[in-house]
């Protein structure tokens, strides 16, 4: 049996480099979040297909590359690390949640696991295979990318438990 342990990761844990659709050529591009010395966050768009590199504003953010219709909803991920996180969560038959150690009242809903949509985290997920197939197709859509442009995949602990 596969086990997933909540490590209290937040959505911002995955948002330092996003895979997006290039607004100029439609190919897969990336947006890097850069924190300046003044504390200002900048978004730098880079596309290896059309060789564009420019700063973009928050409100001009291109659509995510890793998104597809799934189970009547949209499954999306910022990057492959985020996609792997979702995949490991969906695959797991045992999901362990823990409270935020800094939270005085116990549980906190800052954890990405607690903020996943209900259709994705349902324990009796009848659409598990469909979700995993969509994840696989999203992963394959980004296989052609240069490995130096992709974020390192997360080392999400998924354990095998003896029955």
Ranges and model annotations:
Residues 1-61:
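N-terminal cysteine/histidine-rich coordination modules
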Residues 3-7, 11, 17, 24, ...:
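Arginine residue identity/basic-tract feature
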Residues 9, 32, 39, 103, ...:
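Residue-level marker of intrinsically disordered, low-complexity segments enriched
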Residues 20-25, 29, 47, 54, ...:
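Generic structural hydrophobic/aromatic packing signal, biased to beta-strands
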Residues 25-28, 50, 70-71, 123, ...:
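Generic recognition of cysteine residues
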Residues 48-119:
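Long, charge-rich boundary regions
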Residues 120-163:
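C-terminal, charged low-complexity interaction regions
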């Amino acid at each position: 049996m596969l086990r997933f342990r909540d490590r209290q990761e937040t959505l911002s844990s995955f948002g330092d480099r996003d895979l997006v659709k290039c607004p100029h050529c439609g190919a897969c591009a990336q947006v890097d979040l850069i924190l300046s010395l003044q504390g200002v966050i900048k978004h730098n768009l880079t596309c290896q297909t059309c060789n564009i590199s420019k700063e973009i504003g928050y409100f001009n953010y291109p659509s995510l590359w890793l998104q597809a219709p799934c189970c009547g909803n949209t499954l999306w991920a910022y990057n492959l690390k985020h996609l792997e996180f979702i995949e490991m969560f969906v695959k797991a038959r045992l999901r362990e949640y823990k409270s935020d150690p800094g939270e005085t009242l116990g549980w906190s809903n800052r954890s990405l696991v607690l903020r996943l949509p209900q259709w994705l985290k349902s324990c009796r997920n009848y659409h598990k295979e469909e979700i995993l197939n969509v994840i696989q197709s999203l992963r394959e859509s980004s296989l052609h990318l240069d490995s130096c442009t992709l974020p390192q995949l997360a080392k999400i602990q998924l354990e095998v438990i003896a029955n």
